UniProtKB/Swiss-Prot annotation:
It is found in: Cytoplasm. The keyword Chloroplast does not apply. InterPro entries: GK/Ca_channel_bsu, Guanylate_kin-like_dom, Guanylate_kinase, Guanylate_kinase_CS, P-loop_NTPase. ATP binds at residues 12-19. SUPFAM superfamilies: P-loop containing nucleoside triphosphate hydrolases. The lineage of its organism: Bacteria, Bacillati, Cyanobacteriota, Cyanophyceae, Synechococcales. Residues 5-183 form the Guanylate kinase-like domain. It comes from Prochlorococcus marinus (strain NATL2A). PROSITE patterns: GUANYLATE_KINASE_1 (PS00856), GUANYLATE_KINASE_2 (PS50052). It is an enzyme of class 2 (transferase). The keyword Nucleotide-binding applies. The gene is gmk. This is Guanylate kinase.
């Protein structure tokens, strides 16, 4: 009988480097599966059902909510998004390590629905550096930057709720630290 996999939740403010860390983990560790969210929004060009998202009708999504079938779910821009419980549990039971990149409220829901998950908060060295990174993307309006920084200030207060806090001052160091928390072999 193989040993169980683990669920690791990665949270942090927009622009902190979560996506980069996730890509590095997936490139380095074929035994890690990135959880796929379900959504009621329409697929964008090039998105594949079951690969990028599980695309559902609102009625289907509501049925899953009613059956307590999500680890977490939320409504955003008139659409629903959620993490299906069944596939995550199946992967863990087969010994696969599951990684979930999610926002703060979702992480809080998972703390209740799957308390054995290891939760990591990825933090910037400071808000000035975070602002520099967000501006460096070149994709945000001034209003969006202000909104993201305001949300980030609130999220940073919540880092004490997490099992581990990793300061992303250097992407390689942060990556190695998260690998260690996930118990991944080199």
């Amino acid at each position: 009988m193989s040993s169980l996999g683990n669920l690791t939740v990665l949270t942090g403010p927009s622009g902190v480097g979560k996506g980069t860390i996730v890509r590095k983990i997936l490139e380095s560790h074929s035994d890690v599966w990135l959880s796929i969210s379900a959504t009621t929004r329409q697929p964008r060009s090039g998105e594949i059902d079951g690969e990028h998202y599980f695309f559902l009708e609102k009625k289907q999504f509501q049925e899953i909510i009613d059956k307590d079938g999500f680890l977490e779910w939320a409504s955003f821009s008139n659409n629903f998004y959620g993490t299906p419980k069944k596939i995550v549990k199946e992967k863990i039971e087969k010994g696969t390590n599951v990684l979930l990149e999610i926002e703060l409220e979702g992480a809080r829901q998972i703390r209740k629905s799957f308390p054995e998950a290891f939760q990591i908060f990825l933090a910037p060295p400071n808000l000035y550096e975070l602002e520099k990174r967000i501006r460096g993307r070149g994709t945000e309006t001034e209003e969006s930057i202000r909104d993201r920084l305001s949300i980030a200030e609130k999220e940073l207060i919540a880092q004490k709720e997490f099992d581990a806090v990793v300061i992303n001052e250097d992407i390689e160091k942060a990556f190695k630290e998260i690998e260690g928390f996930m118990g991944l072999k080199l």
